[in-house]
Swiss-Prot record:
UniProt xrefs under PANTHER family: OXALOACETATE DECARBOXYLASE BETA CHAIN 2
Protein name: Glutaconyl-CoA decarboxylase subunit beta
Job of this protein: Tunnel subunit of the primary sodium pump glutaconyl-CoA decarboxylase (GCD).
Post-translational modification: The N-terminus is blocked.
Amino acid sequence: MDAFVVALTSVIQDSGFVAFTWGNAVMMLVGCILLYLAIVKGFEPLLLSPIAFGCILANVPRTGFETDPGVMQLILGGIKYEIFPPLIFMGVGAMTDFGPLIANPKTLLLGAAAQIGVFVALLGAMLLGFNVKEASAIGIIGGADGPTSIYLASKMAPHLLGAIAVAAYSYMSLVPLIQPPVMKLFTSKEERKIKMAQLRTVTHFEKVVFPIVTTIFISLLLPSVCSLIGMLMLGNLFTESGCMDRLSDTAQNALMNSVTIMLATGTGLTMKAESFLTLQTIEIICLGLVAFIGGTAGGVLFGKLMSKLDGGKTNPLIGSAGVSAVPMAARVSQVVGQQADPGNFLLMHAMGPNVAGVIGTAVAAGTMLAMVGGK
């Protein structure tokens, strides 16, 4: 009997309940709320669900995830050593059609203009007392690109990774709610009614050459983002070449789904109570909203300028698609345009700045790394 009591006491002392804190309880509640939003409300379920579950796992005491060899340490290593974000970019590249951007190259400027939100949030973060590396990692939320946000945070501010990732993916899911009021604020109804000419046909040769030339140029300009841009364009080359269908299919489906699970779960595993339950987390979430609004406004305002310069041939609404939430931001441009004129079709025109935003966010991240440096 004594031996049983000793064994039972040992089990209790070694259990997670003994080390369980109110912070762990709060974070588990946060995980459950995120699961509710993902599953019931449909907020980025493929991403927020594993992030939320990883958050719950991270706040179980005495698991040894960070110290004991195993699958969880492997997943955390995939984030720490920047393995997963480039692989996600390969899948994104395989699913992306750069045709609208090639057909109308000036929309690249709209993708660049939308990155103003990144730098607005960066300045805001510095004013709130974040150091320049932390501010850079927070600012990239404005690019509406989850993998790039995680990539930059892991290099510049690993302790803020969880908050930055949750803010980025949460606001990406809220693009249809955040963008329309900003778009309508900065445009008149007449501007929203502008119909754009049909895009020219892009040749197969152009689609094959584009990822090769883009990779070489951007990688030479900003070597720090070569892995992101290189994988993005390699995935695109798989699709556009016409002779690598199996690789394209794998990148779009099996690889993309597998890496998404690991990246999102690993992000959740970084959301420990001691690092997440701080005033900084609230500030990051607020700055993320400022970044999204700033990016949308920057794209629309540059679209207005472009419309003035080309005699009203460009609908300013497509500028809001310069954030890299593909294809959600382009769809929002289409919806807002059709609210002004049901016969207005802007989707393909908006896809130009939308895919340019993917490149633009990576370039913005590379610029920050070049200017500030990683960890």
